A protein has these predicted regions:
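A conserved beta-strand->alpha-helix junction
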Residues: 66, 93-106
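Bacterial N-terminal signal peptides that target proteins for export
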Residues: 1-8
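Glycine-rich phosphate-binding loop and adjoining beta1-alpha1-beta2 segment
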Residues: 70-98
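Metal-dependent de-N-acetylase/amidase catalytic core
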Residues: 21-36, 76, 94, 99, ...
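Solvent-exposed loop/turn segments at secondary-structure junctions
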Residues: 40-42, 68-71, 106-110, 138-140, ...
Protein backbone atom coordinates (compact mmCIF):
# COMPACT_ATOMS: atom_id res chain seq x y z
CA UNK A 1 0.00 0.00 0.00
CA UNK A 2 1.41 3.37 -1.01
CA UNK A 3 2.04 6.17 1.47
CA UNK A 4 -0.70 8.41 0.01
CA UNK A 5 -3.25 5.62 0.37
CA UNK A 6 -2.21 5.04 3.96
CA UNK A 7 -2.56 8.74 4.75
CA UNK A 8 -6.03 8.80 3.17
CA UNK A 9 -7.10 5.91 5.38
CA UNK A 10 -5.79 7.82 8.38
CA UNK A 11 -7.84 10.89 7.52
CA UNK A 12 -10.99 8.76 7.20
CA UNK A 13 -10.33 7.11 10.57
CA UNK A 14 -9.52 10.20 12.63
CA UNK A 15 -13.09 11.09 13.60
CA UNK A 16 -13.77 7.57 14.87
CA UNK A 17 -10.67 7.11 17.05
CA UNK A 18 -9.87 8.18 20.61
CA UNK A 19 -7.65 11.04 21.72
CA UNK A 20 -4.11 9.99 22.53
CA UNK A 21 -4.69 10.60 26.26
CA UNK A 22 -7.48 8.04 26.27
CA UNK A 23 -5.58 5.72 23.94
CA UNK A 24 -2.55 5.45 26.22
CA UNK A 25 -4.34 4.86 29.50
CA UNK A 26 -4.11 1.10 28.98
CA UNK A 27 -0.34 1.15 29.60
CA UNK A 28 -0.73 2.28 33.19
CA UNK A 29 -0.08 -0.24 35.94
CA UNK A 30 2.09 -2.77 34.13
CA UNK A 31 5.31 -3.80 35.85
CA UNK A 32 6.85 -6.33 33.46
CA UNK A 33 6.32 -6.70 29.72
CA UNK A 34 7.48 -9.40 27.30
CA UNK A 35 7.51 -8.63 23.59
CA UNK A 36 7.78 -11.95 21.75
CA UNK A 37 8.77 -11.83 18.08
CA UNK A 38 9.63 -14.51 15.57
CA UNK A 39 12.94 -13.02 14.41
CA UNK A 40 15.60 -10.50 15.38
CA UNK A 41 14.15 -7.08 14.44
CA UNK A 42 10.47 -8.10 14.79
CA UNK A 43 9.93 -6.74 18.34
CA UNK A 44 11.88 -3.57 17.53
CA UNK A 45 9.91 -2.73 14.39
CA UNK A 46 6.56 -3.93 15.75
CA UNK A 47 6.58 -1.86 18.93
CA UNK A 48 10.04 -0.45 19.65
CA UNK A 49 8.57 2.95 20.44
CA UNK A 50 6.22 1.46 23.02
CA UNK A 51 9.07 -0.57 24.52
CA UNK A 52 11.13 2.60 24.92
CA UNK A 53 8.18 4.48 26.41
CA UNK A 54 7.53 1.66 28.90
CA UNK A 55 11.17 1.78 30.01
CA UNK A 56 10.84 5.54 30.48
CA UNK A 57 7.83 4.80 32.70
CA UNK A 58 9.97 2.48 34.85
CA UNK A 59 8.53 -0.76 33.47
CA UNK A 60 10.79 -3.80 33.00
CA UNK A 61 10.75 -4.84 29.33
CA UNK A 62 12.13 -8.04 27.81
CA UNK A 63 12.49 -8.64 24.07
CA UNK A 64 12.09 -12.34 23.29
CA UNK A 65 13.15 -13.83 19.95
CA UNK A 66 11.66 -17.17 18.90
CA UNK A 67 14.51 -17.78 16.43
CA UNK A 68 18.02 -16.51 15.83
CA UNK A 69 17.36 -15.29 12.29
CA UNK A 70 19.21 -18.24 10.81
CA UNK A 71 17.71 -17.83 7.33
CA UNK A 72 17.94 -14.06 7.30
CA UNK A 73 21.18 -13.35 5.41
CA UNK A 74 21.52 -14.62 1.82
CA UNK A 75 24.83 -16.33 1.19
CA UNK A 76 25.48 -17.04 4.87
CA UNK A 77 25.10 -20.36 6.65
CA UNK A 78 22.50 -20.73 9.37
CA UNK A 79 25.19 -20.59 12.02
CA UNK A 80 26.84 -17.50 10.54
CA UNK A 81 23.49 -15.75 10.23
CA UNK A 82 22.51 -16.65 13.78
CA UNK A 83 25.70 -15.19 15.21
CA UNK A 84 25.34 -11.95 13.22
CA UNK A 85 21.63 -11.46 13.77
CA UNK A 86 21.60 -12.22 17.49
CA UNK A 87 24.48 -9.78 17.98
CA UNK A 88 22.50 -7.13 16.09
CA UNK A 89 19.43 -7.81 18.23
CA UNK A 90 21.45 -7.43 21.42
CA UNK A 91 22.71 -4.03 20.23
CA UNK A 92 19.16 -2.98 19.36
CA UNK A 93 17.97 -4.01 22.82
CA UNK A 94 20.78 -2.02 24.42
CA UNK A 95 19.69 1.00 22.37
CA UNK A 96 16.15 0.61 23.73
CA UNK A 97 17.24 -0.17 27.29
CA UNK A 98 15.61 -3.60 27.36
CA UNK A 99 16.77 -7.14 28.10
CA UNK A 100 16.97 -9.82 25.39
CA UNK A 101 16.17 -13.54 25.46
CA UNK A 102 16.63 -15.97 22.57
CA UNK A 103 14.65 -19.19 22.29
CA UNK A 104 15.86 -22.14 20.22
CA UNK A 105 13.64 -22.34 17.15
CA UNK A 106 15.09 -22.09 13.63
CA UNK A 107 14.20 -19.25 11.26
CA UNK A 108 12.09 -20.61 8.41
CA UNK A 109 11.50 -23.93 10.16
CA UNK A 110 9.51 -23.01 13.27
CA UNK A 111 7.46 -25.72 14.94
CA UNK A 112 4.33 -26.14 17.02
CA UNK A 113 4.67 -29.18 19.25
CA UNK A 114 4.81 -30.18 22.92
CA UNK A 115 8.49 -29.34 23.27
CA UNK A 116 8.02 -25.85 21.83
CA UNK A 117 5.01 -25.20 24.03
CA UNK A 118 7.01 -26.34 27.05
CA UNK A 119 9.90 -24.03 26.15
CA UNK A 120 7.68 -20.97 25.89
CA UNK A 121 5.55 -21.81 28.92
CA UNK A 122 8.71 -22.28 31.02
CA UNK A 123 9.92 -18.84 29.93
CA UNK A 124 6.63 -17.20 30.83
CA UNK A 125 6.53 -18.97 34.18
CA UNK A 126 10.09 -17.82 34.94
CA UNK A 127 9.57 -14.21 33.84
CA UNK A 128 6.00 -13.76 35.16
CA UNK A 129 4.95 -10.85 32.92
CA UNK A 130 1.70 -8.99 33.38
CA UNK A 131 1.63 -7.99 29.68
CA UNK A 132 2.76 -9.88 26.58
CA UNK A 133 2.83 -8.42 23.06
CA UNK A 134 3.29 -10.66 20.02
CA UNK A 135 2.46 -10.99 16.32
CA UNK A 136 -1.08 -10.67 14.99
CA UNK A 137 -2.00 -14.24 13.91
CA UNK A 138 -3.06 -13.39 10.34
CA UNK A 139 0.27 -12.88 8.60
CA UNK A 140 1.93 -13.87 5.34
CA UNK A 141 5.05 -15.08 7.19
CA UNK A 142 4.66 -18.56 8.64
CA UNK A 143 7.11 -17.92 11.49
CA UNK A 144 4.99 -14.97 12.61
CA UNK A 145 1.87 -17.16 12.61
CA UNK A 146 3.64 -19.88 14.59
CA UNK A 147 4.86 -17.37 17.16
CA UNK A 148 1.37 -15.96 17.58
CA UNK A 149 -0.23 -19.39 18.03
CA UNK A 150 2.37 -20.49 20.59
CA UNK A 151 1.90 -17.32 22.64
CA UNK A 152 -1.90 -17.45 22.45
CA UNK A 153 -1.97 -21.06 23.64
CA UNK A 154 0.52 -20.29 26.42
CA UNK A 155 -1.80 -17.46 27.52
CA UNK A 156 -4.74 -19.87 27.71
CA UNK A 157 -2.61 -22.49 29.46
CA UNK A 158 -1.64 -19.90 32.08
CA UNK A 159 -5.34 -19.30 32.77
CA UNK A 160 -5.02 -15.76 31.43
CA UNK A 161 -2.38 -14.76 33.98
CA UNK A 162 -1.22 -11.85 31.78
CA UNK A 163 -2.80 -9.43 29.32
CA UNK A 164 -2.18 -10.36 25.68
CA UNK A 165 -1.92 -7.81 22.88
CA UNK A 166 -0.98 -8.16 19.22
CA UNK A 167 1.16 -5.77 17.18
CA UNK A 168 1.80 -5.34 13.46
CA UNK A 169 4.85 -5.76 11.24
CA UNK A 170 4.91 -4.33 7.69
CA UNK A 171 1.13 -4.28 7.47
CA UNK A 172 -0.17 -5.18 4.02
CA UNK A 173 2.99 -7.11 3.16
CA UNK A 174 3.17 -9.33 6.26
CA UNK A 175 0.50 -8.47 8.87
CA UNK A 176 -2.96 -8.76 7.27
CA UNK A 177 -6.45 -7.46 8.20
CA UNK A 178 -5.18 -5.79 11.37
CA UNK A 179 -7.88 -3.90 13.30
CA UNK A 180 -6.40 -1.89 16.22
CA UNK A 181 -8.14 -1.44 19.55
CA UNK A 182 -5.35 0.43 21.36
CA UNK A 183 -2.72 3.03 20.41
CA UNK A 184 0.49 4.48 21.87
CA UNK A 185 1.90 7.89 20.97
CA UNK A 186 5.56 7.32 20.07
CA UNK A 187 6.31 10.76 18.63
CA UNK A 188 9.00 11.42 21.25
CA UNK A 189 10.35 7.86 20.98
CA UNK A 190 10.31 7.56 17.18
CA UNK A 191 13.89 8.66 16.55
CA UNK A 192 15.28 6.32 19.21
CA UNK A 193 13.20 3.45 17.80
CA UNK A 194 14.63 4.02 14.32
CA UNK A 195 18.19 4.10 15.68
CA UNK A 196 17.52 0.84 17.51
CA UNK A 197 16.27 -1.14 14.53
CA UNK A 198 19.06 0.24 12.34
CA UNK A 199 21.36 -1.88 14.51
CA UNK A 200 20.21 -4.70 12.22
CA UNK A 201 22.77 -3.80 9.59
CA UNK A 202 22.40 -7.13 7.79
CA UNK A 203 18.79 -6.27 6.86
CA UNK A 204 17.21 -3.80 4.43
CA UNK A 205 16.36 -1.21 7.06
CA UNK A 206 15.67 1.68 4.64
CA UNK A 207 12.78 -0.40 3.23
CA UNK A 208 11.61 -1.26 6.74
CA UNK A 209 11.74 2.39 7.77
CA UNK A 210 9.78 3.51 4.72
CA UNK A 211 7.08 0.97 5.48
CA UNK A 212 6.90 1.50 9.24
CA UNK A 213 7.09 5.30 9.05
CA UNK A 214 3.99 5.21 6.84
CA UNK A 215 2.26 2.85 9.28
CA UNK A 216 3.16 5.01 12.27
CA UNK A 217 1.91 8.15 10.52
CA UNK A 218 -1.38 6.37 9.80
CA UNK A 219 -1.71 5.17 13.40
CA UNK A 220 -0.78 8.65 14.59
CA UNK A 221 -3.55 10.16 12.52
CA UNK A 222 -5.98 7.66 14.02
CA UNK A 223 -5.25 8.96 17.53
CA UNK A 224 -4.42 12.60 16.69
CA UNK A 225 -0.63 12.61 17.03
CA UNK A 226 2.39 12.50 14.71
CA UNK A 227 3.59 8.91 15.18
CA UNK A 228 1.87 6.04 16.95
CA UNK A 229 1.98 2.26 17.26
CA UNK A 230 -1.22 0.25 17.28
CA UNK A 231 -2.28 -2.92 19.07
CA UNK A 232 -5.22 -5.29 19.33
CA UNK A 233 -6.20 -6.74 22.70
CA UNK A 234 -6.98 -10.45 22.95
CA UNK A 235 -10.28 -10.82 24.76
CA UNK A 236 -10.64 -13.50 27.41
CA UNK A 237 -12.66 -16.51 26.23
CA UNK A 238 -13.43 -19.94 27.61
Amino acid sequence: MKTKQILLLGICAMLLCPTIEAAERWLEGYKKVLVIGAHPDDPETMCGGTMIKLRQMGVEVVSVYLTGGEAGIPGKSHEESRIIRTAEAKKACEAMGVRSIFLTQIDGNTEINKARYAELEALIEAEKPDLVITHWPIDSHRDHRVCSILVYDAWRQSRYSFDLYYGEVMTGMQTQTFAPTHWVNITEQHEQKVKAYYCHKSQDMPLVQEWHDAMEILRGMECHTKYAEAFTKQVWTE
